Amino acid sequence: MSLLRIRKASLYGFSTVFILLQSYAVAYPLRAFRQNDGIGIAMNPSQDGGFVSAEKDSDFEYWMKLIISAVLILLGGVFAGLTIGLMGCDDLHLQVLEQSGDASERVHARKVLKLLRRGKHWVLVTLLLGNVIVNETLPIVFDSIIGGGWPAVLISTAMIVIFGEVIPQATCVRYGLSIGAKLEPIVLFMMYLLWPIAYPTALILDACLGESQSTMYKKSGLKTLVTLHRDLGIDKLNQDEVTIITAVLDLREKHAESIMTPIEDVFTLPMDRILDEDLIGEIICAGYSRIPVHKPGFPHDFIGMLLTKTLIGYDPDDKWPVGKFALATLPQTWPNTSCLDLLNYCQEGKSHMILISNSPGEPHGAIGVITLEDIIEELIGEEIIDETDVYIDVHKGLPRVGENNDFWNRMLHRSHLSTMAALHKSQRSHDLAANEHAPILNPKNSALNPRLVTNDRVKVKSPSLIQSSTGYGSMSQSPSRSDLPSKISRVNAELQAHGSQRSSIDVSKENKSSVADGPSSQAHNGPSTQPPEALPNGTDPSSSKTTENNGNQQSERTESADGKKDNSGSISSNSSKTFTGKRVRLGNVIESNVVSPDGTNRIVIEPFERSVDPNNADIVEMVERNGIVVPKVTVTSHEDDVDSVHNTPMSVSSTLSVKTSSSKVPRNKRKRRKGKSKK
């Protein structure tokens, strides 16, 4: 539709210019020409001996000059319109249209990009030179048609301004991409036609001004652009999309200290606290899935966290201390660590709660905790409320109100709403002030201890009833207890059969490869007779073989995780599945293991710029190899590297072993190639 309008406008413009020039030229120039010369109609001799009227020659010349004037006006309009149309096209916008536009926009953007990449200044100088040449030639042609005087000046100026500047530029501002793509051959022809002048001038402009840069937005500009798309444009964004996009752009600049829960508001436990009925009730009523645990008498010296799901099978009558349970690792980090880096760390599955401390790795300095839910709330820009949340915002002390109470959901910010009063029964109407209203539903945790709070849906048996009944509560009385040894032996038999089957497959593979390589390479397939110093990291052959088998098992687990069949042709069991698609931002944070003098291990997460001693074995930069995130190490055969391997933490040393086995395979291949060449 736009191209049809452009063609119609061009046709109307050409017709209008031609008619105006003709009407004025008919009225003035021939009459003025004849009066000024004072000559009548002259007769020119012809070839056949006759005479031809000079009026016919003047009419032909007049019409030719009239057509040339109209063409020059249109060419001037084309050059002026393309100048503002092509120079107004941004490279970044063209790349966006080339990749995400519709079919016509992709074709037009590709043509214009190809033209502008030859040199934007070259295109600019060519169009300006063409416009100048046309505008300087047009008065010369007008003078011979219209003659001098103010009528000629007025008409030529009006023609150039209206049909050579205003209309073309106004059209190309709106349809510059499509017009530039259609006229790309003409511009390319003019570029090479005016190359002796245009190209050197463009080189001078490039040297003085530099190459033109695309329009790049800062994060603040992007947020403003996204906000404008909420109210403008064809594909408008709703408020939720705008909130999430702007929150994602701010996530990297947000520090952990700004969104953490202060340590004073965190539900913590000392490691010597006895887990009895009362403490179990407190944990259930609190509604937290992870509870930080600190040393007795040192509320800021945290050693781990207690996962409440480990208490499912715990009997409160045992009265174990908290420190007797298997505590999960509670990593520590600095207050200014980026929330985006912490999100990537939590994605590795190591911990969903991180301790914020002014001195990570030390038994003091804890100022708060941050969870994966806190980071995701900042990521989406809204609070997440699950079934067991008591507070909407711990920082502001806003309690949770029932989802059907829309009025109190809007009134939670009022100062007269007491946090603790909302946890109890509603006040009576005569106890309320004039500006207060009783909530319809109370913020109440549904997961209460049935031994303390009566619940019709939960039946609690007394201890005497439990002892009198058979097959309940006690492992010795449970019928599944007798089947436990048989289950263990059956599982061990399956594992042993699976291992022997895998080893037989490996042996058959080696035999096939040895037969294919010939006798010269069979010597390298047998047991390794190299000294320990010849192997990577100075490990002995037996350990190297073990790590190689572990590497093969790991590769087989990866295949089974992808849903592929192993070498035996059967699908591997679910127990062999492993997750290898870990997604991290490499080099942003470093995980180090700090051991205090009392033997407590603490995991410290710090930004990459804070590593003052990169040669320390406890601080390893994580890199990605074959889709698995492993520490960045250099495998050498020096003896002093052996000590560094043994001093490395367990996770790092195991990764080093796998790396050693993987680096051993190419060496054997090189030996086989040498054997073939000798043969």
UniProtKB/Swiss-Prot annotation:
Protein name: Uncharacterized protein C4B3.03c
Domain of life: Eukaryota
Transmembrane region(s): 66-86, 122-142, 144-164, 185-205
Positions of modified residues (Phosphoserine): S476, S478, S596
Comp. bias regions, Basic and acidic residues: 556-567
UniProt keyword annotation of RNA-binding present: no
Native source species: Schizosaccharomyces pombe (strain 972 / ATCC 24843)
UniProt keyword annotations, A-Z: CBS domain, Membrane, Phosphoprotein, Repeat, Signal, Transmembrane, Transmembrane helix
